[in-house]
């Protein structure tokens, strides 16, 4: 356990950020799972809306540094490909 005031604060902030990042990562995974579920249900309008939400969530996560921008780009590419394959 740190004794210096600034070190105590850093530990506290690290805990808070860990919780926030875990929550955001979980929300991102949930959004992607909702897209997969919408795609599986064969409801095109619902899947299109879910795709838009998933792409937006990936972009936001990359902008905030939650995931790497290349990871976001790769995931967007893959889900868009799956959507186009299912719709066409």
Curated annotation (Swiss-Prot):
One GO process term, biological-process aspect: translation
Superkingdom in the source lineage: Bacteria
GO molecular function: small ribosomal subunit rRNA binding; structural constituent of ribosome
UniProt key word Methyltransferase: no
Any Gene Ontology CC annotation: small ribosomal subunit
InterPro entries reported in the protein's UniProt record: Ribosomal_bS20, Ribosomal_bS20_sf
Keywords (A to Z) from UniProt: Ribonucleoprotein, Ribosomal protein, RNA-binding, rRNA-binding
SUPFAM superfamilies per the UniProt record, alphabetical: Ribosomal protein S20
A Pfam entry, by short name: Ribosomal_S20p
Family: Belongs to the bacterial ribosomal protein bS20 family.
Function: Binds directly to 16S ribosomal RNA.
NCBIfam families according to UniProt: S20
Protein name: Small ribosomal subunit protein bS20
Organism: Heliobacterium modesticaldum (strain ATCC 51547 / Ice1)
Lineage of producing organism: Bacteria, Bacillati, Bacillota, Clostridia, Eubacteriales
């Amino acid at each position: 356990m740190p004794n210096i005031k600034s070190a105590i604060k850093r530990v506290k902030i690290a805990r808070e950020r860990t919780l926030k990042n875990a929550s955001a990562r979980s929300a991102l995974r949930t959004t992607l799972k909702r897209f997969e579920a919408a795609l599986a249900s064969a409801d095109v309008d619902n899947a299109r809306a879910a795709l838009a939400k998933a792409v937006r969530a990936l972009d936001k996560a990359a902008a905030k540094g939650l995931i790497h921008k290349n990871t976001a780009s790769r995931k967007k590419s893959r889900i868009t490909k799956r959507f186009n394959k299912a719709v066409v």
